[in-house]
């Protein structure tokens, strides 16, 4: 937290006087609607075109500013595919700098996912055909250019990638995209007086404003009934604690790579960089409710954000406003889902590896990333036990593989919370069981390491070859 100056005191007094005159209802009424990214589906062999290019948007006070994104929009469209599809993907780089792309969570051969070895220079394209073999999951695509992934993702090179399967279609889960199945991409940003993104070259990046699908503190009109929220933490360094402002319980149904064994009733869910969760909230009784990060704020809390260098100006993620008549309500309290994730806990005699993340020096086991060095060699079908620890809390992710969390600080993870994952938050020590189902090569290795992209760009990464 920065030191307090006389100017800060004067500033806080003016703000307090101003805010005290504004009713909460008026502040809520000034919200902008949530932007729903366009939906691209690979139906009947239709190619998916993703063109990286500059675009224009307005973050504050209708001030247009240049951003990056895909197909003419800030951020990317939501790509939705089906298990069993062969997806024709067509990237095109219309930016002025080279970009490498990754589909985080996609389970496929390394030469098809993209990654740091697949760099598209300005004006270049790439068109892989992706076999979709994994069950239902929420993945995302983003820039992973070596030493430049944080800046490029921050500017807008990120989008959601949804995989559906037969079980999804047969379930009673909400599945109308943008209506009761809502994508929410979280990014914190710094903006200057012109409304332009500011990127500071610091060890970690913590912005002052929280954007959701590119909009600050938005609202969304939703039908009465169950609403499904798919949340992606696309922030560079910041983690979030998701809760509702009225402290209501909601249902956690899935993490990055698939469903939990059954719905879990919770009041708070944490989200590290690169993590995704799927939530269900019961809005069958109507009314409005707001999803926030952290605690509900009063006037003094809002004034206090002036003095903090790492607090968000507004901690609202989205306000859900119900409309229409009450729909048929299915109580999801005891819904069960098909998943083989818990079976991994019974495996024995696995190779054990330990990784220590020195956050201050951006190293893993005292080494920074070296493109010509292979850090891990393993085989397809192998299951390994990894023990992760860090000098300070930090996000972790792995490409091309999946894992289950076995223990956190030597305490077993509850059976009800076991799901396939590819990202997590290290706060102390975490034990995971990693499954390698797909091959990679020395030219296109899988990458693991910090999901804090600022740290990753400094070298907090490692490479994996799976034969």
UniProtKB/Swiss-Prot annotation:
Keywords: Cell cycle, Cell division, Periplasm, Signal. Residues 1-28 form the signal peptide. One of its GO terms (cellular component) is cell division site. The keyword Signal applies. GO terms for molecular function: copper ion binding. Predicted to be exported by the Tat system. The position of the signal peptide cleavage has not been experimentally proven. GO terms for biological process: FtsZ-dependent cytokinesis. It is found in: Periplasm. It comes from the Bacteria. The keyword Secreted does not apply. Cell division protein that is required for growth during stress conditions. May be involved in protecting or stabilizing the divisomal assembly under conditions of stress. HAMAP family: FtsP (MF_00915). Belongs to the FtsP family. This is Cell division protein FtsP. It comes from Histophilus somni (strain 2336). The lineage of its organism: Bacteria, Pseudomonadati, Pseudomonadota, Gammaproteobacteria, Pasteurellales. The gene is ftsP.
